[in-house]
């Protein structure tokens, strides 16, 4: 195999969710369809590199900063949803369940991975809350050890502020069967049950 092709496969393997076989298939597909797919792929990647940037307010990725969400006058500017990653923001937007603004942390606290409060956008979040513009913070971190640790850290950091804090509910997903749920999910669902 040509060294340049090998190098491209190795590079593709670094992308999330791609192993050696998937990387090989993608590279081979791009090279086989160079006139239709490869050229368009290269042009699009170049355009993204030149035009896409992080929103100075929330951390979203768009061609303008502030992003369209932060610029929108139709959204609640005083309700901010805190998420770990941009993909979480995109998922919430796709669901259409939040009409406020966002704050992307760029990860979750993890001693194992060396992710500390200083490497996340927590200080920037503190400044947003301290400005008085935020009345409610919806902490929408993942239901993982790291996500919950991050959520608790944010609560501690914001103690004493006037901002209302809330967490997303956790528990049994819609459409799931009890037999397929793990003990942790069932435990959370029972602990957070509500009266009807």
From Swiss-Prot:
- Any coiled-coil regions, as ranges: none
SMART domains in the cross-refs: TOPRIM (SM00493)
Domain named Toprim: which ranges? 78-173
Q: PROSITE patterns, from UniProt?
A: TOPRIM
Q: Which UniProt keywords apply?
A: DNA damage, DNA recombination, DNA repair, Metal-binding, Zinc, Zinc-finger
PANTHER family xrefs: RECOMBINATION PROTEIN RECR (PTHR30446:SF0)
What name is this protein filed under? Recombination protein RecR
Originating organism:
Neorickettsia sennetsu (strain ATCC VR-367 / Miyayama)
Q: Which gene encodes it?
A: recR
């Amino acid at each position: 195999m040509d060294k340049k092709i090998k190098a491209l496969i190795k590079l593709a393997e670094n992308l999330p969710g791609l192993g050696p076989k998937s990387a090989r298939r993608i590279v081979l597909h791009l090279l086989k369809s160079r006139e239709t797919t490869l050229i368009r792929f290269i042009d699009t990647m170049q355009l993204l590199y030149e035009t896409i940037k992080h929103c100075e307010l929330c951390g979203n990725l768009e061609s303008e900063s502030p992003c369209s969400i932060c610029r929108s006058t139709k959204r609640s500017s005083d309700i901010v949803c805190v998420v770990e990653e941009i993909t979480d923001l995109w998922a919430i937007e796709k669901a259409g369940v939040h009409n406020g603004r966002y704050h992307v942390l760029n990860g979750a606290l993890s001693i194992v991975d060396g992710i500390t409060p200083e490497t996340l956008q927590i200080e920037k979040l503190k400044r947003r809350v301290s400005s008085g513009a935020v009345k409610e913070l919806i902490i929408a971190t993942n239901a993982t050890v790291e996500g919950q640790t991050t959520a608790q850290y944010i609560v501690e950091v914001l103690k004493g502020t006037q901002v209302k804090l809330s967490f997303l509910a956790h528990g049994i997903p819609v459409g799931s069967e009890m037999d397929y749920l793990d003990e942790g999910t069932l435990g959370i669902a029972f602990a957070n049950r509500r009266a009807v």
